[in-house]
Amino acid sequence: MKAAKNNVYTVSRLNGEVRQILEGQIGKIWLNGEISNFSSPSSGHWYLTLKDTHSQIRCAMFKGRNQSVNFRPVNGQQVLVKGAISVYEPRGDYQLLLESMLPAGDGLLAQEYEALKMKLAAEGLFASETKRALPSNIQRIGIITSATGAALRDVLHVLQRRDASIEVVVYPTQVQGTSASDNICRAIELANKRLEVDVLLLTRGGGSLEDLWCFNNEMLAHSIYNSALPVVSAVGHEVDTTISDYVADVRAPTPSAGAELLSQDKGNKAQKLALMLSRLAQGMRHYQLSQDKHFVNLQHRLNQQDPKRRLQQLEQQFDEFQLRLDNAFKHRLSRLTLRHERLSAQLQRQSPEHKLRLAHQALTHVSGRFDDAIKDTLGSAEQRLKQAVHQLEAMSPLATLSRGYSISSNANGKVITDASKVKVGDSLHTRLAKGQLVSTVIDVEM
């Protein structure tokens, strides 16, 4: 069976194409695991294995990356890493090239945030075509926030200053804590059930990622997306961006900005401008997402031809060769040690005392075998003799005599087998099993 030339791969080609598939389709990922086999050669690069109870994967973190890690990894430590799937082509090893490393626990919220963001984006919750425009004539605003928070005071102050005619309905809720997401969802549901406002403003003041975590909830994202009322998300400060900001119809950077966006000022010019700015910002965000994806693709293509990657690969090869050289030296030393021990043993075996001991052992062994052979031979001969005697006795006429028969012969010693060969007056000798008889024929019956 012949293979087509274009279907026959070289090993290098196969490993190269596998690397391109892994890097192109999987890319960068977050991974949590336990460190084992950690090593740091003189090159400054780190090599380790990440494992869990069922699997493991090799990892490499080059010097330029691991200098930003603020702790020294140790075997058995649980860590969270970010890296790109790749293949170390010279050996065909599937590995992860690490970019960052954190002790387990740190950065998990950020990881969950990115994972949820990617999931909801794939489901279409951030799509611009699903965003609704804000009403042109807003008369009543529903505010979903804490009844005692600074955000509510800021919003009311801005609305009073810009347009005191706008009515406000507050849907008080928790905006921090484990039950806050459920409370916000119920507030959105209540507002949609009553339909007493034109638009909803979801807001709270700034805080840490943990403080704002309730706004990064999947159930809340779907509640905002499914709301019949337009939703403006104004959570935190300008640098804070939550999942609710991506799902909402409009995002405002602060609570005050959200109030300004929903209020009119001097003939509605400010509202129109804010709306335009909001749409522009929204368009810029989507454009940025598109450009980020394009940048990742370009970076991937560049990495495939990047001399730096080749240099990193050569450095990794150097570390591997150095390890192999060390192992070869140890193996050579081990072989020389074994050879020395073997030669010492051979020299010991060549000593006269050792030879005499071996000769005595051999003589004892041969003598024993000789005695056994004689016994076996005599026993076999004795058995054959007994069998021959038994066969001879079985064939001997004397055996017939022992059963009551007799043998008669004439005076010449000739055995008589026919009565016609005997005359009256002949002398006969009859052999019995024990003894014999001498008789004279007085009658012959035919």
Swiss-Prot record:
Q: Entry's NCBIfam families?
A: xseA
Recorded GO terms, molecular function? Answer: exodeoxyribonuclease VII activity; nucleic acid binding
- Quickly give the catalysed reaction: Exonucleolytic cleavage in either 5'- to 3'- or 3'- to 5'-direction to yield nucleoside 5'-phosphates
What family is it from?
A: Belongs to the XseA family.
Q: How does it assemble?
A: Heterooligomer composed of large and small subunits.
Q: Which domain of life is it from?
A: Bacteria
InterPro entries noted in UniProt: Exonuc_VII_L, Exonuc_VII_lsu_C, OB-fold_nuc-bd_dom
E.C. number(s) listed in UniProt: 3.1.11.6
One GO CC term of this entry? cytoplasm
Q: What's the stated role of this polypeptide?
A: Bidirectionally degrades single-stranded DNA into large acid-insoluble oligonucleotides, which are then degraded further into small acid-soluble oligonucleotides.
What's in the keyword line of the UniProt record? Answer: Cytoplasm, Exonuclease, Hydrolase, Nuclease
Q: Which PANTHER family match?
A: EXODEOXYRIBONUCLEASE 7 LARGE SUBUNIT
Annotated GO biological process: DNA catabolic process
Q: What is this protein called?
A: Exodeoxyribonuclease 7 large subunit
Q: Where is this chain's protein located in or outside the cell?
A: Cytoplasm
User: What residue stretch is flagged as signal peptide?
Assistant: none
